[in-house]
């Protein structure tokens, strides 16, 4: 920074250029200091507008603290002075504008993890400096982070910051930006320095995802989501990124990671000492630099034209640094542009806190003018025309609405819908074969094929035999190298193919939501944490079941398969409480193993623990079955409503030798009477109780149970997990696809001869193990 004396102390010592922003009570201009010939930003606060507002103490406090701050990551206030009409703040000019606008207009994409780590490191350094002086910023957001000409991040807008007398001092004022405000602030609870850590977590999420974690169309709904900590981390982020976001966005402020720990987190260590080095077209002299040079000030309420995404502003005393915040935001600047990128208007709520009555002596601060009384509310200024930027904003909306897909660890599978056949093949490629009915050929044909690499970056569009298409085959069509193939990457995929990519990404997301990443056997249940890290399934040994997903929330089923709609009941509470413990434990297991992974050596999928063994006295086992039925006692039922067809009537352990004996005798009678191989399908078996069971070539099993035996359908996946579906229940598409073979199977079973030997065959009744099953069609839907 240039010495203090190099800056003029009257407005006549500056060459005031064009307007950068205009807001509630101040205007910001680009200017050139005639002494130093340095470009600066001048914020001119109109004294007439702030008279009687009662906010003068805030600004005096803000300026007093800001003028004492000096750090590379904090926007600099060079000097200030006043005359009869205005208070002037001479501020550092950040040439590349606010970070959020830079991401949307210049990069047109979220930041990479390495880029985000570089930004985060600078922000954390700045906050460590502020917190070391007991200064709480309270409004860290993407719009309050500015980029200098050399791409260094500057913390700006200290309009809500406050000076704490000690690090553990607490405040009660509700203030901040809704998308970044912490739960304790929204709830009007006491809050301190950890409130800034929550904002840092929201900032990191926004850097990596491109939108804030709690973003909605209305302020109130956003605040509701904040209070509930209702957010979802996309699965495409690395484990380290997800873990750091999770540690920053802890609802309990005492559980949040500290700033020092952020710098030592694996996410930061992995990124190393990287710096921001993105290419840019440079900020324009008018519009671009205004993003950098705005200052916050204090306003009451001003909504922009786009969304009800506002800024919460407290009337509490501001005791903090850098008054070089972005004026365009808080003054309603560039309202028409903000609606396209990061709608943040100014919205302030009066505070219950009182201000220190001590006033700052402007002359004591090196100024020869009377004390300033400033801050008020005024009309937002009209936007400055910027056609080039406006065009860039329009273009920014044109991008694929999903991040690059990733099929890492997903098993090959093939799945058919009405309009397409979706597959994940052995090399991880996603293949979408689009189907169209050809009336001339009287059949459906494959008319378009989209192949996407496992990392989602390469896309091949192919039209086989144009005009005719290909017949539908049992296996995914091979790649045809021809001049008609169109090869693209994720960044240059034409918009006409975006729907294909989104279709594939949703399919991969569905597969992830049904593919276990961590299988954990607790004392009460078998647990599956799915690959997307959000879907969770609990199959209690008692027969109860619990599922958890972002789309459907928590569903609880009792031992009879009936959904418990009242989750406040004692039974539901018990199941939910145990599931929460297991979910947290599975996440911890996953986190630990992620850290242990090196390169391509993956630890997943992983199974932890084993099913508890239930001892049964020999006297309770009927003669002749003691050696063949031990497994029935050691393996309780794992899924709600599932049926173990090796001993089909045993669903749970009960006391009493008579009851157990009768169950086992009934099971002994349910033996195979017919069996045959169906080409292209698998092995079909009819049991003596009327159950028809089809074991498919992928190891999965479909069992159709007659009404006399309880009715319904049981689907056993190739990994041994079974699910029972009652009659008239909605069936997953994978089950319906397998059931489509049933008429053919039943017809052949009618003609099949009876098995001559009635010997109980346990192997025929169980699904093949995953190890021996073929590689295809293992999707768990």
Curated annotation (Swiss-Prot):
CDD domains: POLO_box_Plk4_1 (cd13114), POLO_box_Plk4_2 (cd13115), POLO_box_Plk4_3 (cd13116). The active site is at residue 139. Its main location: cytoplasm. Its EC number is 2.7.11.21. Residues 14-268 form the Protein kinase domain. It is found in: Cytoplasm, Cytoskeleton, Microtubule organizing center, Centrosome, Centriole. Residues 672-751 form the POLO box domain. It is an enzyme of class 2 (transferase). The keyword ATP-binding applies. Residues 463-486 are annotated as: Disordered. The keyword Ubl conjugation applies. One of its GO terms (cellular component) is centriole. Serine/threonine-protein kinase that plays a central role in centriole duplication. Able to trigger procentriole formation on the surface of the mother centriole cylinder, using mother centriole as a platform, leading to the recruitment of centriole biogenesis proteins such as sas-6. When overexpressed, it is able to induce centrosome amplification through the simultaneous generation of multiple procentrioles adjoining each parental centriole during S phase. Belongs to the protein kinase superfamily. Ser/Thr protein kinase family. CDC5/Polo subfamily. Homodimer. PANTHER family: SERINE/THREONINE-PROTEIN KINASE PLK, SERINE_THREONINE-PROTEIN KINASE PLK4. This is Serine/threonine-protein kinase PLK4. It comes from Drosophila virilis (Fruit fly). The lineage of its organism: Eukaryota, Metazoa, Ecdysozoa, Arthropoda, Hexapoda. The gene is SAK.
